[in-house]
């Protein structure tokens, strides 16, 4: 391991000792909030410090085995020990680096999932409907809730646009790599010549903002409009201005909600989407700066970036960011996304590890 990582592990080991002393004092145990905070910190750093202790012990064992190898009587035994200790060190180092990787603070959050039809006309809208069903099925498998925030259905089925809130522990960590352009290749039902058509949709995955900590908006920067809902919902759509549109004037970002009967609830939901979009814009600006010096293996997450192709005639799905092709399109479209999500997460982690070891 390089010196920077060794220094970091040394600091964490010292901090663990400090925390043990603090947590045993009456002053800390009497302050429940502080006690919980320090206990959480200890729980976070203890596993990696334990690994580092094991790493140091194996290093000592390796040094002893090397000394023994100079004695002809123990050479064969020592060389076997040296090989075993080297393997142990490699495995422990990999796990240490994995635990030192920076945690994404948004990973455990709920998300807003936005799907928009792109090129391809009616077929694109139908594909947007397929993607919505795919993510909804996946959420169902994970035990998550799906709430429709707003929708613009197509006349032929599917959606020109649909925005949903997915509520579930770890939703962002599993779906954050879905942002980007999704392309479908298939024969439309209306195609009489059997020709394959290509259509596209864009997907955006935004972590739901913390209601208190993440962002504060100046009311003077907001324009709030109410209007009559144009979608499903019953007779009330012609009687009340329950739909709400909020515009953030400094950025021009807009969010609206018309799914609920209550203007108050629609306003709250639209505000949540607006904040998520503003934060997403800030994060993507930061990522663009970082990408100028290092391009992520799993792509930039830009909405225009084509990330995946769904080829129905060949029964395959290809993720272009990691060159992964799976011949199980029916299962994936039915919500079996684990293999794809896990492969993308693993590639992202590998890129982070590579960056860490280069420092």
Swiss-Prot record:
Coiled coil: none
SUPFAM superfamilies assigned: Release factor
Gene Ontology molecular function terms on file: translation release factor activity, codon specific
Superkingdom: Bacteria
Main location: cytoplasm
InterPro entries: PCRF (IPR005139), Pep_chain_release_fac_I (IPR000352), Pep_chain_release_fac_I_sf (IPR045853), Prokaryotic/Mito_RF (IPR050057), RF-1 (IPR004373)
Single GO cellular component term: cytoplasm
PTM text: Methylated by PrmC. Methylation increases the termination efficiency of RF1.
Entry-linked PROSITE patterns: RF_PROK_I
Sorted UniProt keywords: Cytoplasm, Methylation, Protein biosynthesis
N5-methylglutamine carried by residues: 235
Localization per Swiss-Prot or TrEMBL: Cytoplasm
Function: Peptide chain release factor 1 directs the termination of translation in response to the peptide chain termination codons UAG and UAA.
NCBIfam families: prfA (TIGR00019), PRK00591.1 (NF001859)
HAMAP family: Rel_fac_1
Similarity section: Belongs to the prokaryotic/mitochondrial release factor family.
Protein name: Peptide chain release factor 1
Native species: Nitrosomonas europaea (strain ATCC 19718 / CIP 103999 / KCTC 2705 / NBRC 14298)
Designated gene of the protein: prfA
């Amino acid at each position: 391991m390089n010196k920077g990582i060794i220094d970091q592990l040394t600091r964490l080991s010292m901090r663990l000792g400090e925390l043990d002393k603090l947590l045993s004092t009456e002053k800390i145990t009497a302050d429940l909030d502080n006690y919980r905070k320090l206990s959480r910190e200890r729980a976070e750093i203890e596993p990696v410090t334990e690994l580092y202790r094991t790493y140091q012990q194996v290093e000592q064992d390796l040094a002893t085995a090397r000394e023994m190898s100079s004695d002809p009587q123990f050479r064969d035994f020592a060389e076997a020990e040296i090989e075993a200790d080297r393997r142990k060190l490699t495995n422990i180092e990999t796990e240490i680096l994995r635990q030192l990787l920076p945690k994404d603070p948004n990973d455990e959050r709920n998300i807003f999932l936005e799907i928009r039809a792109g090129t391809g006309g009616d077929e694109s809208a139908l594909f947007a409907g397929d993607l919505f069903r795919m993510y909804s099925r996946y959420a169902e498998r994970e035990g998550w809730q799906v709430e429709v925030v707003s929708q613009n259905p197509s006349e032929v089925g599917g959606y020109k646009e649909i925005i949903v809130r997915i509520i579930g522990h770890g939703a962002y960590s599993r779906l954050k790599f879905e942002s980007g352009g999704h392309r479908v290749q298939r024969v439309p039902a209306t195609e009489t010549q059997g020709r394959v058509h290509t259509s596209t949709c864009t997907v955006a995955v935004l972590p739901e903002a913390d209601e208190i900590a993440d962002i504060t908006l100046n009311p003077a920067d907001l324009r709030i409009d109410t209007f009559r809902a144009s979608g499903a919902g019953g007779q009330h759509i012609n009687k009340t201005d329950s739909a709400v549109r909020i515009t953030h004037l400094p950025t021009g970002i807009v969010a609206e909600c018309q799914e609920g009967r209550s203007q108050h609830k629609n306003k709250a939901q639209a505000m949540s989407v607006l904040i998520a979009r503003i934060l997403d814009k800030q994060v993507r600006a930061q990522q663009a700066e970082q990408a100028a010096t290092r391009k992520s293996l799993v792509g930039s997450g830009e909405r225009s970036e084509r990330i995946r192709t769904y080829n129905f005639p060949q029964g395959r799905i290809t993720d272009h960011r990691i060159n992964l092709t799976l011949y199980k399109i029916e299962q994936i479209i039915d919500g079996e996304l684990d293999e794809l999500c896990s492969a993308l997460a693993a590639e992202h982690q590998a890129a982070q590890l590579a960056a860490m070891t280069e420092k």
